[in-house]
Amino acid sequence: MTSHKKFLNNYFDEQSSCLRELSNNTTLLELVVEKLLDARSSDSLVITIGNGGSASTASHFTADLLKTAIMKDQKRFQSLCLTDNIPVMTAWSNDISFEEIFKEQLKNFIKKNDVLVAFSGSGTSKNIVKALELAKNSGAYLIGFTGMSGGDFNEICDICIKVPSTNMLTIESFHIMLCHVITSCIRQTGTPEFSYE
């Protein structure tokens, strides 16, 4: 039987290294939490997008905002994930192009002071970048979660959270963890409606 010990040790070493780097600078994460709380207070829409594994992260984050982040005696988040409506996505992809699937959906919803949260391991996905550009021109606030060099997210996003890794699996793992960190931080601002302890 082949031993996987070396690989597993190296894998966990990389995760530990990424976690140390992220935990040493939480300033951007604090800004994300504050921006989301502002959006909740003003009834602004928080829209999430992503492709592949990042699509599932986007959907998961919206689910957490809509339920896990419910606080007693406070407004609820208004949130929408654009990867959740498969018929609409395939309609735009089939009739126009895959690059337009998020941009065209945003035209139905996005307005000034809304928040667009984009997930992309590379920060270069064309359909994501096009959506960010439209949202920026609409006066929305842009939050990007990425990795590697950060790609286009570095320039276009108001806040760019970059996982310090070139491994896509590691990047995606940390994106969902960061979403849970943000949700947990929001839950500390009052009395959560639901207990998960």
Stretch-by-stretch model annotation:
Residues 145-157:
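Short, glycine/polar-rich helix-capping loops at beta-to-alpha or helix-loop-helix junctions
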Residues 54-59, 124-131, 153:
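Short glycine/serine/threonine-rich phosphate/pyrophosphate-binding segments
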Residues 1-24:
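Generic N-terminal amphipathic, Lys/Arg-enriched alpha-helix
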Residues 83, 120, 146, 161-169:
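Short beta->alpha connector loops at strand-helix junctions that form conserved
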Residues 35-109:
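Glycine-rich, small/polar surface segments that engage phosphate groups of diverse ligands
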Residues 108-109, 116, 169-197:
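A charged, well-structured terminal subsegment
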Residues 21-42:
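A short, well-structured juxtamembrane/interface segment
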